[in-house]
Amino acid sequence: MDVNPTLLFLKVPAQNAISTTFPYTGDPPYSHGTGTGYTMDTVNRTHQYSEKGKWTTNTETGAPQLNPIDGPLPEDNEPSGYAQTDCVLEAMAFLEESHPGIFENSCLETMEVVQQTRVDKLTQGRQTYDWTLNRNQPAATALANTIEVFRSNGLTANESGRLIDFLKDVMESMDKEEMEITTHFQRKRRVRDNMTKKMVTQRTIGKKKQRLNKRSYLIRALTLNTMTKDAERGKLKRRAIATPGMQIRGFVYFVETLARSICEKLEQSGLPVGGNEKKAKLANVVRKMMTNSQDTELSFTITGDNTKWNENQNPRMFLAMITYITRNQPEWFRNVLSIAPIMFSNKMARLGKGYMFESKSMKLRTQIPTEMLASIDLKYFNEPTRKKIEKIRPLLIDGTASLSPGMMMGMFNMLSTVLGVSILNLGQKRYTKTTYWWDGLQSSDDFALIVNAPDHEGIQAGVDRFYRTCKLVGINMSKKKSYINRTGTFEFTSFFYRYGFVANFSMELPSFGVSGINESADMSIGVTVIKNNMINNDLGPATAQMALQLFIKDYRYTYRCHRGDTQIQTRRSFELKKLWEQTRSKAGLLVSDGGPNLYNIRNLHIPEVCLKWELMDEDYQGRLCNPLNPFVSHKEIESVNNAVVMPAHGPAKSMEYDAVATTHSWIPKRNRSILNTSQRGILEDEQMYQKCCNLFEKFFPSSSYRRPVGISSMVEAMVSRARIDARIDFESGRIKKEEFAEIMKICSTIEELRRQK
């Protein structure tokens, strides 16, 4: 069918055509190899922005540190990190004046959180720098290792399970003269394989004890490991991101809790809300500015971009902000919150894996670890790398670089938003004391500035004043990358505003399609994505119906489950045809079993099994939903699962979908090759931890417990719970006397074994 494309736009308002400008088909770029170069760039750039600051030496670690605070006022438009303490404090004071009681209330809310948070909060999150092994690990493993080391060094406050008590241990660990840790290492040896008679490398894993003196321990505790940010579109160069270790994480969490609580109360803040709630909040600010600028005033909006936001922020400024925000609070609370910025003022950046060299002629490859960069002859490197290394050398200690200024990506998003909003807040007429005034939106480093004034000169003056005020607190608006427009058209955090936020449905395109988890989850995720886009992104009924048909087609090709009566031949068609022929009610077969598709845009919210249940043959029902089916390793049956979907822009989003466990909810087995590497010991620890937690969850309904810490308490809790449950079941006649006696006997045996151990 030939369509004249101009017909598509006949009755469409211009802003709705945004979805046709979508540039992001295909895969985003991923980084390969080492991130060392990117990290060195970050460290060198950060120091360059603050180069006129004062140099000092950290007495504990011997690290050279640069402090740009209260440095020279800028005389040009170059980005700089010379924030002025008194200006930041004044901005905070005015913010409080405009929002009476905001800091007080947020402190009270945070204090409650601090006293209630369990240490398992730190198991959330992906890769975390594990200081005991000096590399990245899943968060739960890194936490378990840290606690294990703390306990073996006599730090036991963490046993209460409260995060605040774990942090007491962290503080105490920094005063210790030495810490003993267990590290994993691997031995390689060449042996002859009996079968093939070839030489093979055998690896064995060992654990060994190692003592760290105070200085080495402090360096590790203050280290942020770095990686390359993956899947960033629209950039030529990759960049580095940081993962902090367990010592820093807990403190950061509390600071961000406080800042989040403040952001929730600020109408200009684009955090912590998202999606439609965020759009509504932002639309209010725009509406306010437009209604106030009736006929007498002009109103312009800047779609803003800041130069290197976090490299010009400074932890010392955040310390000043926290000191002010918590000024009437109890001493212990002020101390807990000030530790994160203090640790960040003394942070060390781990430079990653180092450089890989290869000689084409001799077919040799060798890794130069970052520890060697301080001493290696620079003649082996190319010119740009040589310059980088020369610049960073004075900052190197044990393969990490001292990085006092700057914040590293994504650490204090909420708190830096508070700083940005405090400058937007100064735009009220009572503060500008002139004819122009401004307001705007801030979300981490992204901002939109709305300026109102009687004439163009006033607008220009307002923008200049805003620009200079920002400079005073270390925010550098980029004049090259920001643009100004009549209010009513601007972009903020990838939302495009034109007389209201425009639904840019094409941003969600990458998340349409088959996820590849398993047949059951993929079907559910696929229809949920379509449903969500109908709700949130103006996906119209006709387009949705088409998306659904394309999805089903895609799904059938992926899992080779074409309808039982189709002519298409695949590896599965023989079995599916047989099933089709012996099924009485063919409409009841799932799509993944060669059945027809019963979905349309009205019933996307119903899981397929429920949609077809009444139509299924009885024996098919019995096979499909049979927990005893030996071929299925069942996931836990939860009513809601989470899938990770990738929009074109911004971070991966978590999306909930209904999960009905059937024989199609299989889990692919893990790749076995990991078992031959040094990760093996860690993997076993992790599986052990998972097993314990899963077992524990069987005993306690999810409402009544928080994930435990420390094995000792878990066993006792499970035994006593088993006894109580058994007694109740016995008295109500649910179990027989013999079963009750057997349970009691098992419980006693477990306790006996623990006593012997």
UniProtKB/Swiss-Prot annotation:
<keyword id="KW-1262">Eukaryotic host gene expression shutoff by virus</keyword>
<keyword id="KW-0548">Nucleotidyltransferase</keyword>
<keyword id="KW-0696">RNA-directed RNA polymerase</keyword>
<dbReference type="GO" id="GO:0003723">
    <property type="term" value="F:RNA binding"/>
</dbReference>
<keyword id="KW-0808">Transferase</keyword>
<feature type="compositionally biased region" description="Polar residues">
    <location>
        <begin position="55"/>
        <end position="64"/>
    </location>
</feature>
<keyword id="KW-1191">Eukaryotic host transcription shutoff by virus</keyword>
<keyword id="KW-1104">Inhibition of host RNA polymerase II by virus</keyword>
<feature type="short sequence motif" description="Nuclear localization signal">
    <location>
        <begin position="187"/>
        <end position="195"/>
    </location>
</feature>
<dbReference type="InterPro" id="IPR001407">
    <property type="entry name" value="RNA_pol_PB1_influenza"/>
</dbReference>
<feature type="short sequence motif" description="Nuclear localization signal">
    <location>
        <begin position="203"/>
        <end position="216"/>
    </location>
</feature>
<protein>
    <recommendedName>
        <fullName>RNA-directed RNA polymerase catalytic subunit</fullName>
        <ecNumber>2.7.7.48</ecNumber>
    </recommendedName>
</protein>
<dbReference type="GO" id="GO:0003968">
    <property type="term" value="F:RNA-directed RNA polymerase activity"/>
</dbReference>
<dbReference type="GO" id="GO:0000166">
    <property type="term" value="F:nucleotide binding"/>
</dbReference>
<dbReference type="GO" id="GO:0006351">
    <property type="term" value="P:DNA-templated transcription"/>
</dbReference>
<keyword id="KW-0693">Viral RNA replication</keyword>
<dbReference type="GO" id="GO:0039694">
    <property type="term" value="P:viral RNA genome replication"/>
</dbReference>
<comment type="function">
    <text>RNA-dependent RNA polymerase which is responsible for replication and transcription of virus RNA segments. The transcription of viral mRNAs occurs by a unique mechanism called cap-snatching. 5' methylated caps of cellular mRNAs are cleaved after 10-13 nucleotides by PA. In turn, these short capped RNAs are used as primers by PB1 for transcription of viral mRNAs. During virus replication, PB1 initiates RNA synthesis and copy vRNA into complementary RNA (cRNA) which in turn serves as a template for the production of more vRNAs.</text>
</comment>
<feature type="region of interest" description="Promoter-binding site">
    <location>
        <begin position="249"/>
        <end position="256"/>
    </location>
</feature>
<keyword id="KW-0597">Phosphoprotein</keyword>
<dbReference type="GO" id="GO:0030430">
    <property type="term" value="C:host cell cytoplasm"/>
</dbReference>
<dbReference type="GO" id="GO:0019083">
    <property type="term" value="P:viral transcription"/>
</dbReference>
<keyword id="KW-0547">Nucleotide-binding</keyword>
<dbReference type="GO" id="GO:0039657">
    <property type="term" value="P:symbiont-mediated suppression of host gene expression"/>
</dbReference>
<feature type="region of interest" description="Disordered">
    <location>
        <begin position="50"/>
        <end position="82"/>
    </location>
</feature>
<keyword id="KW-1048">Host nucleus</keyword>
<keyword id="KW-1190">Host gene expression shutoff by virus</keyword>
<dbReference type="InterPro" id="IPR007099">
    <property type="entry name" value="RNA-dir_pol_NSvirus"/>
</dbReference>
<keyword id="KW-1195">Viral transcription</keyword>
<comment type="similarity">
    <text>Belongs to the influenza viruses polymerase PB1 family.</text>
</comment>
<keyword id="KW-0945">Host-virus interaction</keyword>
<dbReference type="GO" id="GO:0042025">
    <property type="term" value="C:host cell nucleus"/>
</dbReference>
<dbReference type="Pfam" id="PF00602">
    <property type="entry name" value="Flu_PB1"/>
</dbReference>
<dbReference type="GO" id="GO:0039523">
    <property type="term" value="P:symbiont-mediated suppression of host mRNA transcription via inhibition of RNA polymerase II activity"/>
</dbReference>
<feature type="domain" description="RdRp catalytic">
    <location>
        <begin position="286"/>
        <end position="483"/>
    </location>
</feature>
<comment type="subunit">
    <text>Influenza RNA polymerase is composed of three subunits: PB1, PB2 and PA. Interacts (via N-terminus) with PA (via C-terminus). Interacts (via C-terminus) with PB2 (via N-terminus); this interaction is essential for transcription initiation.</text>
</comment>
<keyword id="KW-1035">Host cytoplasm</keyword>
